[in-house]
Structure formats: C-alpha cells, structure tokens
Amino acid sequence: MPVLRQLPRWAWIGGGVLAFIAGIVNAAGYMGFRHQSITNLTGSTSLLGVAFGTGDGGEAWHWGLSIGAFLIGAILSGMIVQQSTLKLGRRYGLALILESLLLFAAVPLLDAGSPVGLYLAAMGAGLQNGMASTYSGMVFRTTHVSGMFTDLGIYIGQRLRGLEVDTLRIRVCVLVVTTFTLGSAVGALLFGVLGERTLLIPAVLTGLCGVGYGLYCQYKAGWGATGDVDAG
C-alpha cells in the first residue's frame, strides 16, 4: 500500500501561495530588461560559466552578483529560521516580511533599469528558498520545480513497476508545479500592465503571508496548540 502521511493545512496553503508568488517573480524576471531567471540559479550558473569561457568580464560580474545575492538570502534565511524541520512556530513570518521588503526595494531600481534591483529580488528569492523545510524526509521548496518534476518522474516509474509510492510527495509536487505555473501566467499578464513594477504584487503578497503566519501562530498558541507539525 502507498505510504500515507498528512501535511498540516497551513503548510499546504503556505506552500501553494509561495510557489505562486515565486512564479510571478520569475516571470517578471524573464520579461524584464535583462530577461533572466530570478528564483533559481541553474541558468545563471551556466551563464556565469559562459561568461568565463568567452572572457566577458561584465557578464561574469553580473551573474556572479546574482548568484551571490541569492546565496546571501539563503544565508539570512538559515540565520532567521534556524531549523529545517517543518513546524508551526518557526520564524517563517520574519523571513517573509524581510523578503517583502527586499522586493519592494527592488521595484524602483528595476523600473530605472538598474541590475541592483535584480540582485535584491534574487536575495529575496534565496530567502524564500532557504525556508525550504523537511517533513518526514521530504524537501518542500517553492521557488523552482526541477526537483519536483524529477520526483514526479521517479514516482511514476516506481508505480509502473508496481512499487509503493508516497502519495503525499506526489501531491506536494503537483501543488508546487501547478501553483508556480499559475503564478508565471499571472506574472506575464501583470507585466503587460505594470512592467517592471510587477514585483509590487509579490512584495505585497509575501508581506501579507508573513503577517498572516504570525497572527495564525498567535491564534494557535492562544488555543493551547503544541506547535507540533501534526497540528493544523
């Protein structure tokens, strides 16, 4: 029989919303003046290597700063959240509010065509991705989907061979892939109206998520919740 586990409701909602937000941010990056990804580093790292290979110092500097900004965001997330195990009460709210501030700060710079705005947005994405938590061995990331598609392929292959499949992992993969794709579509529509100011929308949403998470934690604490991940 497939392995059956539960993920708390707040984690389902939060994970879906954050993947949706990341989709908007990444779409805005691709449609912006540099046409680059913001929420993941695979392409950026390849382009850094290309810049080294072609001797383009300016591009190497740009991609190095983009990668470094993402890394700094992840470092900040590690310092704020501190633990990788998914659990209500972790300081996700503070991390999200900081991400919101970084995205707000990026908007006027992007509107002016400054790459510094991209670095701030990348730092925010690293901060969000650094919040990735582990639940019963499952990594829950929300800013890129390569791993999700890989996991889906593995699970489908295992199922075709008649092996046990972890249905919770499949549902998480489908959730993140679907909401990230929807966010990208919405991001494209928003960019057609707002241009580089599109990041105002994810900035507001991440701020609301941070505040909402903090209020939810207080609500659960007020009702004597233990804060265990199985609550919710």
Predicted feature locations:
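Symmetry-related core transmembrane helices of the 12-TM Major Facilitator Superfamily/SLC fold
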Residues: 94-101, 197-214
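Hydrophobic/small/kink-forming positions within alpha-helical transmembrane segments
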Residues: 48, 67, 71-75, 104, ...
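Small-residue-rich hydrophobic segments that form or flank transmembrane alpha-helices
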Residues: 8-60, 126-168
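Cytoplasmic-side transmembrane-helix entry/capping segments in multi-pass membrane proteins
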Residues: 89-98, 117-120, 141-145
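C-terminal ends and interior cores of transmembrane alpha-helices
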Residues: 100-114, 213-214
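Multi-pass alpha-helical transporter architecture, strongest
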Residues: 110, 205-224
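Helix-to-loop junctions at the C-terminal end of transmembrane segments
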Residues: 75-88, 191
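Short, Lys/Arg-rich, polar N-terminal cytosolic tail immediately upstream
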Residues: 1-11, 223-224
